[in-house]
Amino acid sequence: FFHLEHRDYPTFTELYQFIENRADESYKMISSEMMKHILLYIKSAYDGALSPLFNGITNIDAEDFIDFDMRDLMQGSEECQRAVLFNISTYLWNRILLKEGWTMLAIDELHMYLQHPYMRKTLQSMVLRARKYNAMIWCATQQITHCLNPQYAYEVSSLLNSSPIKFLFNLGDVELGEVKKALSLKDGEIKCIAAAVKRHCLVLAGKERYAIEVGTLPYEEHLFGKGGGQ
């Protein structure tokens, strides 16, 4: 794999045409009928609904920083979401297993991924095993209550309990008792984030609790600008 360029790998078009050209031939190990079944399985990735996602040369660069823009995907069909999430999570975990230096996996809008059973199981496994492969996992969500769905409370509690450091900002207009119970917070700790105060948050580091004000370093404005994420 280290000697091949991304353009050296076949696309689904090439695979489909290769099998189609041989579908009427007879082989000892595979029948013509079996090859036609294979064509049916891969047709959606060849020229069907999944073709825009799967049928083409990869545009993933093997660089130090890779960004997967999932916004449009998460608005698509359930079938597309499952297929792409499976491929991406498999790719990410394989990269982590290589142990090529230190790796950080950052996931924004965590609650959206927790809606998928496969992703819940995958994230749970990653969080428990990542440190063995010189990796760390960083997750963020605007509303932690969106993650506290009773249907998958066990998997989410595993994610929360395995996280050594948590940053909690003001939670907005939500039921604080639910968050207090999920994160084992005391009344005084919940008070720290009960009001919306810009840049103030509660940090949970193991058994330690810190009420802090988040500042900026001199060079950060040059790197990120003043748009506040815009």
Predicted segments with their positions:
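Conserved ATP-driven motor cores of ASCE-family P-loop NTPases powering translocation/secretion/packaging/pilus
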Residues: 118, 122-217
